Design a protein with these regions (language model features):
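Metal-cofactor-binding active-site regions of metalloenzymes
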Residues: 1-185, 194-205, 210, 216-276
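Conserved hydrophobic beta-strand within the GNAT/NAT acetyltransferase core sheet
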Residues: 187-189
Length: 276
């Protein structure tokens, strides 16, 4: 019996191979990583105190995603790594403006990543797609990536906002989400990770077809009585998938231990969860 697996929530800049990061740092003379002996431990950051602290490592990975060649390789290796884990369908997200420079346009960034994915598909059969991310702590960034997503919607599979969730609720970007929905760009919105149920509700109100993380929907459920609050009811009745990322939640200290994670409660309640 073959088990077909999918990954719906993965950040391209969060999964560089340690050896590749070291090699690219040397090639590009990226000094912050040149003297790091154990890059894998440096990136794992399992002792992070918060989501914001955890995200600091992304500064270094995105710095290496500065050329067509690097992006293409990183995308290929990401899809290859997924294939080696038994994944047949892979959706990866990335904030393209991190890579735009004098020699790379937004289209170049998208094309480079898709080229890497296509190479992996040709070699292994894995199907991969790109979700563009705007950074929610930078309003102008979200506006620009919205335009990019609309202009190149045939080359991508969706749009998201990433970055620190607290204090940057989805409602701040209602105009952008409206434009994306009007142009038939699929929305999955980070919510219910760094902030609570209100953030999830705002994501739904703005057209999200999936919720990135969404684990804090558990706060809208009375586990003793089995009663759902309005947001949990909407997700349950409309079969809105939650992109649960258990190890990420542990690394960012949302939960101190795997046994404390509410994934089993959500599964037992028949919520539409995916594990990433």
């Amino acid at each position: 019996c073959v088990m077909y697996k999918a990954v719906l929530h993965d950040h391209l800049d969060g999964g560089l191979r340690a050896a590749t990061a070291k090699e690219l740092a040397i090639k590009d003379n990226y000094s912050p990583l040149l003297n790091v002996d154990d890059i894998e431990s440096f990136f794992n950051r399992e002792s992070s105190e918060s989501l914001e602290d955890y995200l600091e490592a992304f500064v270094h990975t995105t710095a290496l995603m500065n050329s067509y060649e690097n992006l293409e390789r990183i995308a290929f290796e990401a899809a290859e790594d997924m294939h080696n884990e038994g994944i047949t369908h892979y959706e990866s997200r990335y904030a393209p403006l991190y890579s735009v420079n004098n020699s790379l346009t937004p289209k170049d960034v998208i094309d480079a990543i898709n080229s890497g994915f296509k190479q992996a598909e040709d070699l292994y059969g894995i199907q991969s797609g790109l979700i563009l991310c705007g950074m929610r702590n930078d309003t102008n960034n979200v506006k620009q990536v919205t335009e990019i997503a609309v202009n190149y919607k045939e080359k991508i599979i969706g749009f998201d906002i990433a970055g620190p969730e607290l204090n940057y609720l989805p409602s701040l970007f209602s105009d952008e989400f409206k434009k994306l929905v009007e142009n038939n760009v699929n929305l999955t919105i980070h919510a219910g990770e760094g902030d609570g149920v209100n953030s999830i509700q705002e994501a739904l109100d703005n057209g999200a077809k999936r919720i990135g993380h969404g684990v804090r929907i558990i706060e809208d459920i009375d586990l003793e009585t089995g009663l759902f609050g309005p947001t949990a009811t909407h997700i349950f009745e409309n079969n809105i998938p939650l992109e649960i990322c258990i190890s990420s939640n542990i690394h960012t200290n949302m939960y101190s231990d795997y046994k404390d994670h509410p994934i089993k409660d959500l599964i037992d309640l028949n919520f539409p969860v995916t594990i990433n």
